[in-house]
Protein backbone atom coordinates (compact mmCIF):
# COMPACT_ATOMS: atom_id res chain seq x y z
CA UNK A 1 0.00 0.00 0.00
CA UNK A 2 1.49 3.36 -1.01
CA UNK A 3 1.98 6.05 1.64
CA UNK A 4 -0.35 8.90 0.66
CA UNK A 5 -0.35 11.88 3.02
CA UNK A 6 -2.88 14.63 2.24
CA UNK A 7 -0.57 17.39 3.46
CA UNK A 8 1.97 16.47 0.76
CA UNK A 9 -0.57 17.64 -1.84
CA UNK A 10 -1.54 20.88 -0.06
CA UNK A 11 -4.88 19.35 0.91
CA UNK A 12 -6.11 20.48 4.32
CA UNK A 13 -7.76 18.05 6.74
CA UNK A 14 -10.28 20.78 7.62
CA UNK A 15 -11.08 22.54 4.36
CA UNK A 16 -9.83 20.08 1.74
CA UNK A 17 -8.96 21.65 -1.59
CA UNK A 18 -10.11 25.17 -0.66
CA UNK A 19 -7.25 27.65 -0.37
CA UNK A 20 -6.55 28.87 3.18
CA UNK A 21 -8.11 32.35 3.60
CA UNK A 22 -6.08 35.06 1.95
CA UNK A 23 -6.27 38.82 1.50
CA UNK A 24 -9.19 39.97 -0.68
CA UNK A 25 -6.95 42.28 -2.67
CA UNK A 26 -3.45 42.41 -4.13
CA UNK A 27 -0.85 45.05 -3.13
CA UNK A 28 -1.31 48.65 -4.36
CA UNK A 29 0.76 48.16 -7.53
CA UNK A 30 -1.98 45.79 -8.77
CA UNK A 31 -4.83 48.20 -7.96
CA UNK A 32 -6.11 48.22 -11.61
CA UNK A 33 -6.67 44.43 -11.36
CA UNK A 34 -8.27 44.74 -7.91
CA UNK A 35 -10.59 47.46 -9.16
CA UNK A 36 -11.69 45.80 -12.39
CA UNK A 37 -12.19 42.37 -10.83
CA UNK A 38 -14.33 43.87 -8.03
CA UNK A 39 -16.42 46.11 -10.29
CA UNK A 40 -16.90 43.50 -13.02
CA UNK A 41 -20.61 42.74 -12.34
CA UNK A 42 -21.69 46.40 -12.55
CA UNK A 43 -19.42 47.30 -15.49
CA UNK A 44 -20.56 44.28 -17.52
CA UNK A 45 -24.21 45.12 -16.78
CA UNK A 46 -23.66 48.67 -18.07
CA UNK A 47 -21.65 47.38 -21.09
CA UNK A 48 -18.60 49.41 -20.01
CA UNK A 49 -16.29 46.56 -18.97
CA UNK A 50 -14.56 45.95 -22.31
CA UNK A 51 -13.62 49.60 -22.69
CA UNK A 52 -12.35 49.71 -19.11
CA UNK A 53 -10.16 46.63 -19.75
CA UNK A 54 -8.67 48.20 -22.88
CA UNK A 55 -7.51 51.14 -20.75
CA UNK A 56 -5.85 48.93 -18.15
CA UNK A 57 -2.03 49.30 -17.93
CA UNK A 58 0.23 46.33 -18.62
CA UNK A 59 1.48 45.25 -15.17
CA UNK A 60 4.44 43.08 -14.29
CA UNK A 61 3.20 39.88 -12.64
CA UNK A 62 6.71 39.06 -11.41
CA UNK A 63 6.04 41.58 -8.61
CA UNK A 64 3.57 39.10 -7.09
CA UNK A 65 4.93 37.58 -3.90
CA UNK A 66 4.25 33.93 -3.13
CA UNK A 67 1.81 31.22 -4.08
CA UNK A 68 -1.38 32.65 -2.63
CA UNK A 69 -0.91 36.10 -4.16
CA UNK A 70 -0.42 34.39 -7.52
CA UNK A 71 -3.61 32.36 -7.06
CA UNK A 72 -5.51 35.56 -6.26
CA UNK A 73 -4.00 37.28 -9.33
CA UNK A 74 -5.01 34.30 -11.48
CA UNK A 75 -8.56 34.53 -10.14
CA UNK A 76 -8.74 38.27 -10.88
CA UNK A 77 -7.30 37.91 -14.38
CA UNK A 78 -9.57 35.03 -15.44
CA UNK A 79 -12.59 36.95 -14.16
CA UNK A 80 -11.45 39.98 -16.16
CA UNK A 81 -11.01 37.70 -19.20
CA UNK A 82 -14.48 36.24 -18.78
CA UNK A 83 -16.15 39.65 -18.43
CA UNK A 84 -14.22 40.95 -21.43
CA UNK A 85 -15.09 38.03 -23.70
CA UNK A 86 -18.75 37.54 -22.79
CA UNK A 87 -19.97 41.06 -21.91
CA UNK A 88 -22.20 41.08 -25.01
CA UNK A 89 -23.39 37.49 -24.58
CA UNK A 90 -22.44 34.38 -26.50
CA UNK A 91 -23.30 36.03 -29.84
CA UNK A 92 -21.11 39.07 -29.22
CA UNK A 93 -17.89 37.43 -28.08
CA UNK A 94 -14.51 38.67 -29.27
CA UNK A 95 -11.66 36.45 -30.41
CA UNK A 96 -8.64 38.37 -29.11
CA UNK A 97 -7.63 39.10 -25.53
CA UNK A 98 -5.67 42.36 -25.08
CA UNK A 99 -2.05 42.12 -23.96
CA UNK A 100 -2.66 43.90 -20.64
CA UNK A 101 -4.66 40.81 -19.57
CA UNK A 102 -3.26 38.01 -21.70
CA UNK A 103 0.44 38.48 -20.93
CA UNK A 104 0.32 38.56 -17.12
CA UNK A 105 -2.38 35.83 -17.15
CA UNK A 106 -0.23 33.62 -19.34
CA UNK A 107 2.84 34.14 -17.18
CA UNK A 108 1.14 33.67 -13.82
CA UNK A 109 -0.58 30.54 -15.19
CA UNK A 110 2.79 29.11 -16.17
CA UNK A 111 4.14 29.84 -12.69
CA UNK A 112 1.18 28.07 -11.05
CA UNK A 113 0.80 25.20 -13.53
CA UNK A 114 -2.80 26.34 -14.14
CA UNK A 115 -4.50 26.92 -17.50
CA UNK A 116 -4.88 30.59 -18.56
CA UNK A 117 -8.67 30.35 -18.38
CA UNK A 118 -11.40 30.48 -15.74
CA UNK A 119 -11.35 27.21 -13.77
CA UNK A 120 -13.12 25.80 -10.75
CA UNK A 121 -9.85 26.28 -8.85
CA UNK A 122 -10.35 30.04 -9.35
CA UNK A 123 -14.04 30.71 -8.87
CA UNK A 124 -14.44 28.22 -6.05
CA UNK A 125 -11.19 27.09 -4.42
CA UNK A 126 -9.51 30.52 -4.38
CA UNK A 127 -12.67 32.63 -4.32
CA UNK A 128 -14.57 30.96 -1.46
CA UNK A 129 -13.27 31.98 1.95
CA UNK A 130 -14.14 29.86 4.97
CA UNK A 131 -15.36 32.15 7.74
CA UNK A 132 -16.90 30.86 10.98
CA UNK A 133 -17.83 27.57 9.34
CA UNK A 134 -19.58 29.33 6.46
CA UNK A 135 -18.48 30.37 2.96
CA UNK A 136 -17.93 33.96 1.91
CA UNK A 137 -17.53 34.70 -1.81
CA UNK A 138 -14.82 37.31 -2.50
CA UNK A 139 -15.39 38.12 -6.19
CA UNK A 140 -18.56 37.76 -8.21
CA UNK A 141 -19.39 37.14 -11.83
CA UNK A 142 -22.24 39.21 -13.32
CA UNK A 143 -25.74 38.21 -12.30
CA UNK A 144 -26.17 39.35 -8.70
CA UNK A 145 -27.50 37.19 -5.89
CA UNK A 146 -28.25 34.07 -7.99
CA UNK A 147 -24.71 33.93 -9.35
CA UNK A 148 -23.18 34.54 -5.93
CA UNK A 149 -25.34 31.74 -4.54
CA UNK A 150 -24.06 29.30 -7.19
CA UNK A 151 -20.47 30.15 -6.23
CA UNK A 152 -21.22 29.91 -2.51
CA UNK A 153 -22.90 26.50 -2.78
CA UNK A 154 -19.92 25.14 -4.75
CA UNK A 155 -17.79 26.33 -1.82
CA UNK A 156 -20.14 24.69 0.70
CA UNK A 157 -19.88 21.34 -1.13
CA UNK A 158 -16.07 21.61 -1.13
CA UNK A 159 -16.11 22.48 2.56
CA UNK A 160 -18.36 19.50 3.39
CA UNK A 161 -15.91 17.28 1.52
CA UNK A 162 -12.92 19.06 3.06
CA UNK A 163 -13.99 18.06 6.54
CA UNK A 164 -13.52 14.41 5.56
CA UNK A 165 -9.75 14.86 5.30
CA UNK A 166 -9.04 12.92 8.48
CA UNK A 167 -11.49 10.17 7.46
CA UNK A 168 -9.72 9.76 4.10
CA UNK A 169 -6.35 9.68 5.82
CA UNK A 170 -7.67 7.02 8.24
CA UNK A 171 -8.80 4.82 5.34
CA UNK A 172 -5.41 5.16 3.65
CA UNK A 173 -3.35 4.68 6.82
CA UNK A 174 -5.62 1.84 7.99
CA UNK A 175 -5.23 0.07 4.64
CA UNK A 176 -1.47 0.45 4.76
CA UNK A 177 -1.24 -0.95 8.30
CA UNK A 178 -3.98 -3.59 7.81
CA UNK A 179 -5.84 -1.85 10.66
CA UNK A 180 -9.47 -2.89 10.08
CA UNK A 181 -10.96 -0.71 12.80
CA UNK A 182 -9.20 2.42 11.52
CA UNK A 183 -10.40 1.78 7.99
CA UNK A 184 -13.96 1.09 9.12
CA UNK A 185 -14.09 4.27 11.17
CA UNK A 186 -12.68 6.19 8.17
CA UNK A 187 -15.44 4.82 5.92
CA UNK A 188 -18.14 5.64 8.46
CA UNK A 189 -16.97 9.26 8.79
CA UNK A 190 -16.58 9.56 5.04
CA UNK A 191 -20.15 8.30 4.54
CA UNK A 192 -21.38 11.11 6.78
CA UNK A 193 -19.29 13.65 4.87
CA UNK A 194 -20.72 12.53 1.51
CA UNK A 195 -24.21 12.93 3.00
CA UNK A 196 -23.23 16.46 4.02
CA UNK A 197 -22.01 17.17 0.48
CA UNK A 198 -25.45 16.20 -0.80
CA UNK A 199 -27.17 18.41 1.77
CA UNK A 200 -24.93 21.29 0.67
CA UNK A 201 -25.58 20.64 -3.03
CA UNK A 202 -29.34 20.61 -2.38
CA UNK A 203 -29.03 24.21 -1.18
CA UNK A 204 -28.56 25.26 -4.82
CA UNK A 205 -32.40 25.20 -4.98
CA UNK A 206 -32.73 27.90 -2.30
CA UNK A 207 -31.52 30.82 -4.40
CA UNK A 208 -30.67 29.76 -7.94
CA UNK A 209 -33.28 29.33 -10.66
CA UNK A 210 -32.59 27.09 -13.69
CA UNK A 211 -33.11 30.05 -16.03
CA UNK A 212 -30.58 32.13 -14.15
CA UNK A 213 -27.97 29.37 -14.14
CA UNK A 214 -28.41 28.50 -17.81
CA UNK A 215 -28.68 31.99 -19.24
CA UNK A 216 -26.95 34.10 -16.58
CA UNK A 217 -24.10 32.00 -15.12
CA UNK A 218 -23.19 29.33 -17.72
CA UNK A 219 -22.26 31.74 -20.56
CA UNK A 220 -19.52 33.31 -18.39
CA UNK A 221 -18.00 29.85 -17.84
CA UNK A 222 -17.62 29.15 -21.57
CA UNK A 223 -14.37 27.85 -22.99
CA UNK A 224 -13.13 28.58 -26.48
CA UNK A 225 -12.16 26.61 -29.57
CA UNK A 226 -14.06 23.61 -30.92
CA UNK A 227 -17.36 23.33 -32.77
CA UNK A 228 -19.59 23.87 -29.73
CA UNK A 229 -17.89 27.11 -28.71
CA UNK A 230 -19.18 30.59 -29.58
CA UNK A 231 -15.49 31.35 -30.27
CA UNK A 232 -15.00 28.22 -32.36
CA UNK A 233 -11.61 29.23 -33.77
CA UNK A 234 -10.04 29.67 -30.33
CA UNK A 235 -8.75 32.74 -28.52
CA UNK A 236 -5.68 34.78 -29.41
CA UNK A 237 -3.67 35.89 -26.37
CA UNK A 238 -2.25 39.13 -27.76
CA UNK A 239 1.41 39.72 -26.92
CA UNK A 240 1.87 35.99 -26.29
CA UNK A 241 1.19 34.36 -29.66
CA UNK A 242 -0.91 34.95 -32.78
CA UNK A 243 -1.93 31.29 -32.78
CA UNK A 244 -5.45 30.87 -31.34
CA UNK A 245 -5.67 28.73 -28.21
CA UNK A 246 -8.36 26.17 -27.31
CA UNK A 247 -9.57 25.72 -23.72
CA UNK A 248 -12.50 23.81 -22.24
CA UNK A 249 -15.03 25.72 -20.17
CA UNK A 250 -15.04 26.19 -16.41
CA UNK A 251 -17.11 23.60 -14.55
CA UNK A 252 -17.52 22.11 -11.10
CA UNK A 253 -16.53 18.89 -12.88
CA UNK A 254 -13.03 20.31 -12.29
CA UNK A 255 -13.58 19.74 -8.56
CA UNK A 256 -11.26 16.98 -7.36
CA UNK A 257 -13.80 15.69 -4.82
CA UNK A 258 -15.49 12.96 -6.85
CA UNK A 259 -12.24 11.87 -8.49
CA UNK A 260 -10.65 11.46 -5.05
CA UNK A 261 -13.55 9.24 -4.04
CA UNK A 262 -13.16 7.26 -7.28
CA UNK A 263 -9.47 6.72 -6.57
CA UNK A 264 -9.93 5.93 -2.91
CA UNK A 265 -12.84 3.52 -3.39
CA UNK A 266 -11.23 1.84 -6.42
CA UNK A 267 -13.98 2.91 -8.84
CA UNK A 268 -12.97 2.65 -12.49
CA UNK A 269 -14.58 3.93 -15.69
CA UNK A 270 -14.40 2.96 -19.35
CA UNK A 271 -11.40 4.43 -21.23
CA UNK A 272 -13.67 6.90 -23.07
CA UNK A 273 -15.22 8.30 -19.88
CA UNK A 274 -11.89 8.25 -18.08
CA UNK A 275 -10.37 10.24 -20.96
CA UNK A 276 -12.75 13.14 -20.19
CA UNK A 277 -12.08 12.90 -16.45
CA UNK A 278 -8.33 12.85 -17.17
CA UNK A 279 -8.65 15.91 -19.41
CA UNK A 280 -10.44 17.68 -16.56
CA UNK A 281 -7.42 17.00 -14.31
CA UNK A 282 -5.37 19.31 -16.53
CA UNK A 283 -7.53 22.17 -15.24
CA UNK A 284 -6.79 21.46 -11.57
CA UNK A 285 -3.84 22.75 -9.50
CA UNK A 286 -0.86 20.43 -10.17
CA UNK A 287 -0.63 19.10 -6.59
CA UNK A 288 -4.30 18.04 -6.67
CA UNK A 289 -3.77 16.41 -10.05
CA UNK A 290 -0.77 14.56 -8.60
CA UNK A 291 -2.85 13.33 -5.67
CA UNK A 292 -5.42 11.88 -8.08
CA UNK A 293 -2.68 10.18 -10.10
CA UNK A 294 -1.16 8.66 -6.94
CA UNK A 295 -4.56 7.45 -5.71
CA UNK A 296 -5.41 5.96 -9.11
CA UNK A 297 -2.04 4.21 -9.33
CA UNK A 298 -2.03 2.68 -5.83
CA UNK A 299 -0.71 -0.84 -6.40
CA UNK A 300 -3.01 -2.40 -3.79
CA UNK A 301 -6.48 -0.91 -4.09
CA UNK A 302 -8.70 -0.24 -1.09
CA UNK A 303 -11.53 -2.64 -2.20
CA UNK A 304 -8.92 -5.39 -2.50
CA UNK A 305 -7.71 -4.74 1.05
CA UNK A 306 -11.31 -4.76 2.31
CA UNK A 307 -12.08 -8.03 0.49
CA UNK A 308 -8.96 -9.73 1.80
CA UNK A 309 -9.87 -9.01 5.43
CA UNK A 310 -13.22 -10.84 5.04
CA UNK A 311 -14.33 -8.66 7.95
CA UNK A 312 -18.11 -8.14 8.05
CA UNK A 313 -17.95 -4.81 9.89
CA UNK A 314 -15.38 -3.36 7.53
CA UNK A 315 -17.25 -4.60 4.46
CA UNK A 316 -20.45 -3.04 5.76
CA UNK A 317 -18.72 0.30 6.37
CA UNK A 318 -17.14 0.21 2.89
CA UNK A 319 -20.45 -0.64 1.22
CA UNK A 320 -22.22 2.12 3.15
CA UNK A 321 -19.70 4.61 1.86
CA UNK A 322 -20.10 3.42 -1.73
CA UNK A 323 -23.91 3.61 -1.38
CA UNK A 324 -23.68 7.22 -0.17
CA UNK A 325 -21.47 8.08 -3.14
CA UNK A 326 -23.92 6.44 -5.58
CA UNK A 327 -26.71 8.47 -4.01
CA UNK A 328 -24.67 11.66 -4.26
CA UNK A 329 -23.92 11.07 -7.96
CA UNK A 330 -27.62 10.33 -8.56
CA UNK A 331 -28.58 13.55 -6.83
CA UNK A 332 -26.02 15.48 -8.89
CA UNK A 333 -27.66 14.08 -12.07
CA UNK A 334 -30.97 15.54 -10.87
CA UNK A 335 -29.25 18.90 -10.41
CA UNK A 336 -27.75 18.76 -13.92
CA UNK A 337 -31.15 17.79 -15.36
CA UNK A 338 -32.83 20.74 -13.67
CA UNK A 339 -30.20 23.40 -14.32
CA UNK A 340 -29.02 22.35 -17.78
CA UNK A 341 -31.22 19.86 -19.59
CA UNK A 342 -34.63 21.30 -18.63
CA UNK A 343 -33.41 24.90 -18.54
CA UNK A 344 -32.01 24.68 -22.08
CA UNK A 345 -35.47 23.86 -23.49
CA UNK A 346 -33.67 22.02 -26.30
CA UNK A 347 -32.55 18.51 -27.28
CA UNK A 348 -28.90 19.52 -27.29
CA UNK A 349 -28.21 21.54 -24.15
CA UNK A 350 -25.03 23.54 -23.94
CA UNK A 351 -23.38 21.74 -21.04
CA UNK A 352 -20.24 23.03 -19.40
CA UNK A 353 -16.86 21.40 -20.02
CA UNK A 354 -18.22 18.18 -21.54
CA UNK A 355 -19.55 19.78 -24.72
CA UNK A 356 -16.12 21.29 -25.41
CA UNK A 357 -14.73 17.79 -25.90
CA UNK A 358 -17.17 17.39 -28.79
CA UNK A 359 -19.65 15.13 -26.96
CA UNK A 360 -23.38 15.53 -26.40
CA UNK A 361 -24.42 12.43 -24.42
CA UNK A 362 -24.30 14.34 -21.14
CA UNK A 363 -26.82 12.46 -19.00
CA UNK A 364 -25.84 8.96 -20.28
CA UNK A 365 -22.24 9.86 -19.40
CA UNK A 366 -23.14 10.91 -15.85
CA UNK A 367 -25.39 7.84 -15.39
CA UNK A 368 -22.65 5.46 -16.52
CA UNK A 369 -20.19 7.11 -14.14
CA UNK A 370 -22.77 6.64 -11.37
CA UNK A 371 -23.34 2.98 -12.34
CA UNK A 372 -19.58 2.31 -12.33
CA UNK A 373 -19.61 3.54 -8.72
CA UNK A 374 -22.16 0.92 -7.71
CA UNK A 375 -20.07 -1.90 -9.19
CA UNK A 376 -17.48 -1.84 -6.39
CA UNK A 377 -20.08 -2.92 -3.78
CA UNK A 378 -19.04 -6.19 -2.11
C1 LIG B 1 -26.00 24.11 -10.68
C2 LIG B 1 -25.13 23.21 -10.26
C3 LIG B 1 -24.38 22.24 -11.14
C4 LIG B 1 -24.54 21.99 -12.46
C5 LIG B 1 -25.52 22.61 -13.44
C6 LIG B 1 -23.56 20.98 -12.82
C7 LIG B 1 -23.38 20.48 -14.10
C8 LIG B 1 -22.46 19.51 -14.45
C9 LIG B 1 -22.23 19.03 -15.79
C10 LIG B 1 -22.91 19.58 -17.04
C11 LIG B 1 -21.31 18.07 -15.73
C12 LIG B 1 -20.71 17.27 -16.92
C13 LIG B 1 -19.34 17.80 -17.21
C14 LIG B 1 -19.36 19.22 -17.77
O1 LIG B 1 -19.96 19.45 -18.84
O2 LIG B 1 -18.73 20.09 -17.17
C15 LIG B 1 -20.93 17.92 -14.35
C16 LIG B 1 -20.02 17.03 -13.88
C17 LIG B 1 -19.50 17.05 -12.62
N1 LIG B 1 -19.86 17.91 -11.60
FE1 LIG B 1 -21.43 19.19 -11.63
N2 LIG B 1 -22.84 20.64 -11.71
C18 LIG B 1 -23.30 21.40 -10.67
C19 LIG B 1 -22.80 21.41 -9.39
C20 LIG B 1 -21.69 20.73 -8.99
C21 LIG B 1 -21.01 20.91 -7.74
C22 LIG B 1 -21.39 21.93 -6.67
C23 LIG B 1 -19.97 20.05 -7.72
C24 LIG B 1 -18.89 19.84 -6.67
C25 LIG B 1 -18.36 20.81 -5.98
C26 LIG B 1 -19.99 19.31 -8.97
C27 LIG B 1 -19.07 18.36 -9.34
C28 LIG B 1 -19.06 17.68 -10.54
C29 LIG B 1 -18.12 16.61 -10.87
C30 LIG B 1 -17.00 16.10 -9.99
C31 LIG B 1 -18.43 16.20 -12.16
C32 LIG B 1 -17.74 15.07 -12.96
C33 LIG B 1 -18.66 13.89 -13.11
C34 LIG B 1 -18.59 12.91 -11.95
O3 LIG B 1 -17.50 12.66 -11.41
O4 LIG B 1 -19.66 12.31 -11.62
N3 LIG B 1 -21.04 19.75 -9.71
N4 LIG B 1 -21.64 18.81 -13.60
From Swiss-Prot:
Protein name: Myoglobin
GO CC terms: cytoplasm
Cofactor(s) named in the record: heme
Keyword annotations from UniProtKB, A to Z: Heme, Iron, Metal-binding, Oxygen transport, Transport
Co-factor note (free text): Binds 1 heme group per subunit.
Gene Ontology annotations of biological process type: 'de novo' NAD biosynthetic process from L-tryptophan; L-tryptophan catabolic process to kynurenine
UniProt cross-references to Pfam families, sorted A to Z: IDO
UniProt superkingdom: Eukaryota
Positions that bind heme: 332
Known partners and oligomeric status: Homodimer.
Native organism taxonomy: Eukaryota, Metazoa, Spiralia, Lophotrochozoa, Mollusca
GO terms of molecular function: heme binding; indoleamine 2,3-dioxygenase activity; metal ion binding; oxygen carrier activity; tryptophan 2,3-dioxygenase activity
Keyword Metal-binding: yes
PROSITE patterns for the chain: IDO_1 (PS00876), IDO_2 (PS00877)
Role description: Serves a reserve supply of oxygen and facilitates the movement of oxygen within muscles.
Family: Belongs to the indoleamine 2,3-dioxygenase family.
InterPro entries: Indolamine_dOase, Trp/Indoleamine_2_3_dOase-like
Amino acid sequence: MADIQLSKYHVSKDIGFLLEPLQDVLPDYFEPWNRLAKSLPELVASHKFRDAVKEMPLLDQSKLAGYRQKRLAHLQLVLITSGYLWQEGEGGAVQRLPECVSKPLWNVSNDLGLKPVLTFADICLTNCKVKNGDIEVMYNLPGGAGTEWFLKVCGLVELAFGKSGQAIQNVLDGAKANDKAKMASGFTDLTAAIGNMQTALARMNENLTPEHFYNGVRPFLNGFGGPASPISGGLVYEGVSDKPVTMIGGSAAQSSTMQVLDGLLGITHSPEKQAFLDEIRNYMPPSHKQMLADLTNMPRKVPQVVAETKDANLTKAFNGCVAAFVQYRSYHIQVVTKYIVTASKSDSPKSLAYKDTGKSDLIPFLKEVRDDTEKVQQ
